[in-house]
Design a protein with these regions (language model features):
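Short beta->alpha transition motifs characteristic of CBS
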Residues: 63-70
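Short, basic and Ser/Thr-rich N-terminal targeting/leader segments
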Residues: 48-52, 96-98
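Short beta-strand scaffold segments in enzyme catalytic cores
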Residues: 52-60
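Zinc-dependent deaminase
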Residues: 1-44, 111, 115-209
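A short, polar/charged loop-to-alpha-helix boundary motif
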Residues: 72-82
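Small-residue (primarily alanine) positions within well-ordered alpha-helices
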Residues: 37, 41-44, 54, 64, ...
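Immediate flanking context of iron-sulfur cluster ligation sites
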Residues: 94-107
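Residues that line or immediately flank small-molecule/substrate-binding pockets and catalytic motifs
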Residues: 70, 104, 128
Length: 209
């Protein structure tokens, strides 16, 4: 489900590489859209997926939503950001989105960061950092790579505690369930373990090695 999109289509070129808002109004606005991304993250959690959610915003309206689905879809590319970008491209009729912003509850990985740059997003906002696979400053910073032909501005740490706590609670519950299974002599087959502070190589769904 999406909010009512703006009436006119987005141009294919003319990316804007400056933050759309600054100051206290930006904080309130970013929190509003991050809370929408958190709603998506909770949908992922309810489906047994690692709780990461994303929304795409255009002209102050949410035009697309997505949450983590790699386990159920058996698709390693089905991260929340990719789901939201695919949905947004269908809404606007173009894979280029230079007037759009993306909000995601976890720092994007290299795959998702690359897709955002290919889409020529105007601005990206994330919640919790990912010290193992984050590609917006934690492990590497694709958004600061001046050799790329497009630069997307990025801001992190919006509702970071809330976004991070959702992930920590999820993995804590999963570890308890795994211990209970082992105590009962049952093999644990469900993939996707890790945490924000101690993540696996892919906190969005890849099994631990």
């Amino acid at each position: 489900m999406t909010d009512t999109p703006p009436p006119s289509p987005i141009a294919a070129t003319g990316a804007i590489a400056t933050p759309p808002f600054e100051g206290p109004l930006a904080d309130a606005r970013d929190q509003r859209f991050m809370r929408a991304a958190l709603e998506e993250a909770r949908l992922a959690e309810a489906a047994g997926e690692v709780p990461v959610g994303a929304v795409v915003v255009w002209n102050d309206a949410i035009i697309a939503r997505g949450h983590n689905l790699p386990i159920r879809s058996r698709d390693p590319s089905a991260h929340a950001e990719m789901q939201a970008l695919r949905a947004a491209a269908q809404v606007i009729g173009n894979y280029r989105m230079p007037e759009c912003e993306l909000y995601v509850t976890l720092e994007p990985c290299a795959m998702c960061s690359g897709a955002m740059l290919h889409a020529r997003l105007r601005h990206v906002v994330f919640g919790a950092t990912d010290p193992k696979t984050g590609a917006a400053g934690s492990v590497l910073d694709l958004f600061a790579e001046a050799r790329l032909n497009h630069q997307t501005t990025i801001r992190g740490g919006v509702l970071a505690d809330e976004c991070g706590q959702l992930l920590r609670d999820f993995f804590r519950a999963r570890r308890r369930a795994q211990k209970a299974d082992r105590a009962g002599g049952q093999a644990v087959t469900e993939p996707g373990n890790g945490s924000v502070t101690e993540p696996s190589s892919d906190p969005q769904g890849k099994p631990d090695a």
